[in-house]
Amino acid sequence: ELYYFLGIEVIQTRVGIMISQRHYILNLLYKFGMTECKPMTTPLERNLKIDASSGTATSESIQYHQLIGSLIYLTITRPNLSYSVNLLSQFMQNPRNLHLNCTKRILRYVSTTVDYGILYKSNTTIRLEGYTDADWAGYKADRRSTSGFVFSLGSGAISWSSKK
């Protein structure tokens, strides 16, 4: 019986199969000193406007790079983080304190949703569904659009993306 695969937990129940990265999240919170952090109900502030020149330069760019890389890996089982992580990954070249604070906010959100993952229900009709959305030039700094999609088979996502 499969329990772990490439750091992803595989939980088999009567309802179906769930993939999760609970253990990875707990290690991530420990690594970045956020095991006792204040919980958040959303990954980012609502209507957050952020660009490459927001705030002051951070002296912790290595930590920022590590956080973004870790969060990108986490999107394997947490597609709900894709937009936020994609937005913040655009500032890898010159991260600012605001960008670092936003990545830490995502970790605070993740700390409250540790048990989230993707559930593939065993009694669901197998049907391929796709959804897409775009903000059409929503990023004011360069007037570029952000678009995204998700495809699900049965009850669980099988492919997703968010791109600028």
Regions found by a protein language model. Name each.
Residues 3-17:
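Short, conserved secondary-structure transition motifs
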